[in-house]
């Protein structure tokens, strides 16, 4: 079935969301990322899969990890990489994102990695793109961040094995506003995770059906019991300004991951965080830097995953 991101043969033509991506496609991407992760962290030389292909990182929001990761991934595949900076571009003169895309297409750019503050913005750009152009959603609004979801799944596979059927995964924090949480939820369901628990203040839990089938609660200590993996979400400080969280201190008291709390989970529970970490809010230093932390592994895996996605779409 042809969709916005799948062609009539079920092959990816864009990566906009993990929702609706077939299990076989997810597994192929994860397997490929696993195969090339040594190259992704610099231990193998540059490849030429995308030699002569122009890729643009089209970011309308600030980013460090994601943008750098995509840049390295495209570079290591041999692509010509163009970094678009909205703060110095014609968008400041009123040019639309669509016109920016079409002008860059006219220059021969074939791949676009897009981050945008608005929900659905990347999907709208994909609809405007010409034949043979591929778009990758690097995060739009609160909708989706598919490559973050993929790198989280790769990290879980490395820490816990490829069979997710018995995994108990806890997602903690501001799920309501998190595009990472939505992508993780879609991926975990598709890969058959045994139990998905979602925990956070009532004001930060969504009510739009995304949590269907999850175990939902506000008691973090209870949710930790026997957990195999913890996905800690960044608390945006504007949530406190909006009155959704009384204070950072109270949030940490109720939902911060400390060494003592971590002991309630499985003895080898993996700790993930998409970054940037608010140390002392979501996670203490000793947990973030401890033996069970997978945070830097996530960062390294991000390059491998993005190489696999770029290779699949443009190779």
UniProtKB/Swiss-Prot annotation:
Protein EC: 2.1.3.2
GO cellular component, one term: cytosol
Disulphide connectivity of cysteines: none
Reactions it catalyzes: carbamoyl phosphate + L-aspartate = N-carbamoyl-L-aspartate + phosphate + H(+)
GO biological process: 'de novo' pyrimidine nucleobase biosynthetic process; 'de novo' UMP biosynthetic process; amino acid metabolic process
This protein's UniProt keywords: Pyrimidine biosynthesis, Transferase
Entry keyword Amino-acid biosynthesis: no
A Pfam family: OTCace
GO molecular function: amino acid binding; aspartate carbamoyltransferase activity
SUPFAM superfamilies: Aspartate/ornithine carbamoyltransferase
Superkingdom to which the source organism belongs: Bacteria
Residues where carbamoyl phosphate binds: 65-66, 115, 145, 148, 275-276
Sites where the protein binds L-aspartate: 93, 179, 234
Pathway terms, separated by semicolons: Pyrimidine metabolism; UMP biosynthesis via de novo pathway; (S)-dihydroorotate from bicarbonate: step 2/3
Summary of subunit composition and partner proteins: Heterododecamer (2C3:3R2) of six catalytic PyrB chains organized as two trimers (C3), and six regulatory PyrI chains organized as three dimers (R2).
Stated role: Catalyzes the condensation of carbamoyl phosphate and aspartate to form carbamoyl aspartate and inorganic phosphate, the committed step in the de novo pyrimidine nucleotide biosynthesis pathway.
Recorded family membership: Belongs to the aspartate/ornithine carbamoyltransferase superfamily. ATCase family.
Name of protein: Aspartate carbamoyltransferase catalytic subunit
């Amino acid at each position: 079935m042809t969709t916005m991101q799948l062609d009539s043969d079920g092959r990816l033509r864009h990566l906009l969301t993990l929702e609706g991506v077939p299990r076989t496609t997810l597994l192929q991407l994860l397997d490929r990322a696993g195969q090339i992760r040594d190259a992704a962290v610099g231990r193998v030389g540059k490849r030429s899969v995308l030699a002569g292909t122009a890729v643009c990182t089209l970011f309308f929001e600030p980013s460090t990890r994601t943008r750098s990761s995509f840049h390295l991934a495209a570079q290591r595949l041999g692509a010509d990489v163009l970094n678009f900076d909205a703060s110095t571009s014609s968008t400041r003169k009123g040019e639309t994102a669509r016109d920016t895309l079409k002008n860059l297409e006219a220059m021969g750019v074939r791949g676009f990695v897009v981050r945008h503050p608005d929900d659905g913005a990347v999907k709208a750009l994909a609809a405007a793109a010409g034949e043979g152009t591929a778009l990758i959603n690097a995060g739009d609004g609160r909708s989706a961040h598919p490559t973050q979801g993929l790198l989280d799944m790769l990290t879980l596979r490395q820490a816990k094995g490829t069979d997710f059927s018995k995994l108990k995964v806890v997602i903690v924090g501001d799920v309501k506003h998190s595009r990472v949480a939505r992508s993780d939820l879609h991926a975990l369901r598709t890969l058959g995770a045994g139990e998905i628990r979602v925990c956070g203040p009532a004001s930060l839990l969504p009510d739009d059906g995304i949590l269907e089938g999850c175990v939902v609660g506000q008691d973090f200590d209870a949710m930790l019991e026997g957990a195999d993996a913890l996905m800690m979400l960044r608390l945006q400080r504007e949530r406190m300004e909006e009155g959704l969280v009384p204070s950072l201190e109270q949030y940490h008291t109720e939902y911060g991951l400390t060494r003592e709390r971590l002991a309630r989970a499985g003895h080898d529970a993996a700790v993930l965080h998409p970054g940037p970490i608010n140390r002392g809010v979501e996670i203490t230093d000793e947990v973030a830097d401890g033996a069970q932390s997978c945070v830097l592994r996530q960062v390294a895996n991000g390059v491998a995953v993005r190489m696999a996605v770029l290779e699949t779409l443009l190779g």
